[in-house]
Amino acid sequence: MNSLSKYIRQRFNISLWCLVAIMLIALSLKEFSISLVHVYSIPFVLFFLFTMRLFDDLASAKIDSEEANRDYTNEVTKKELQTILIISQIVLISILAFFDMERAVNLFFFLVFNTILYYLLFNVSKFRHFLPLLKYPFVIYILNLEPSFNLIAVYVAFVIFEMLEDPLFPNYLLTNYKAAIPDKKIIPYLFLLLFLLTQIILKNV
């Protein structure tokens, strides 16, 4: 359990990820009306995001071994966290199956599909940065079970966010932005907020 608590301290800012969970739930709304179901969804979405974050970090352990405060790159800690990851995935599917078997099946296939993608593409550097972002549109899909172009918009929005926020993320069209405004750390978050507000407004027009 010590390895888990240390991992959470190093890699999972609960306050920040709670905000991400709330944002994703808001994006899943068909109209701007919040029910108790949406409130109850927050812990589940947060747990899912934690599980996927852990999955990605363990996949990146070899690459991140030179980085500071990355205890999950230690072989002993990594094995402990791999066990925790498997347990977390089983718990996620079990919780969802208790309430909705269709959603549980969708989650199971997503986890399998995501693992296959990591196995095939993670070592191809141009794909490595994009794979962890698949979890965001999936959260919205699992909440409302409606495939739509909105899922693509959410994925693209998080790609842009990462381009703005992460200096290691492929630059593409934002090279000039990063060179001109290197210290504007608030801009990526303002972009996500603007995207969220735009989506809410469009759904209620």
Can you say where each PLM-predicted feature lies in the sequence?
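Multi-pass alpha-helical membrane architecture of UbiA-family
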Residues: 1-205
